[in-house]
Amino acid sequence: PEYAERALHTISVTYQRSHDEKFGGILHMLSDNGTDEQYKDWNAARHLKWDEKVWWTQAEALCALLTSADRTGDSAAWEEFKTLFLWCREHFFDPDYGEWYAVLNRDGSPRMKLKGGIQKAAFHIPRALYQCSCILKKYVAETGDCDAQT
């Protein structure tokens, strides 16, 4: 139980510090106090900037936030999940060809049109969304409510 409480607390604090209040989504890299001061040119070799939105981070955050909401019943966690899910659907998902873009600019526009590559395959996004759908199905089965939280 102690580890579970720590994990759920970490999810909440991490989301609160990394959520981009100006444009939405999760920022790629921040310092441990939630600022960008030390990461202006972070990971230049991989061509990722601190303020970009990376598919993997968003997908894992969706799973973590929904798991936290499910385990705690915390309405704030439900709202954080819903906010991030709707943002991802609007910005990452390509309605014409499916799948998510790999990297977005800070404002949510696609930085590149790629949807696959060395590190991004057609596994993580379906797995994350499937995991979320399982939690949501469980919630609906237990409560009969498909509108209140999500």
Where are the predicted features?
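Glycan-recognition and catalytic cores of secretory/periplasmic carbohydrate-active enzymes
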Residues: P1-T150
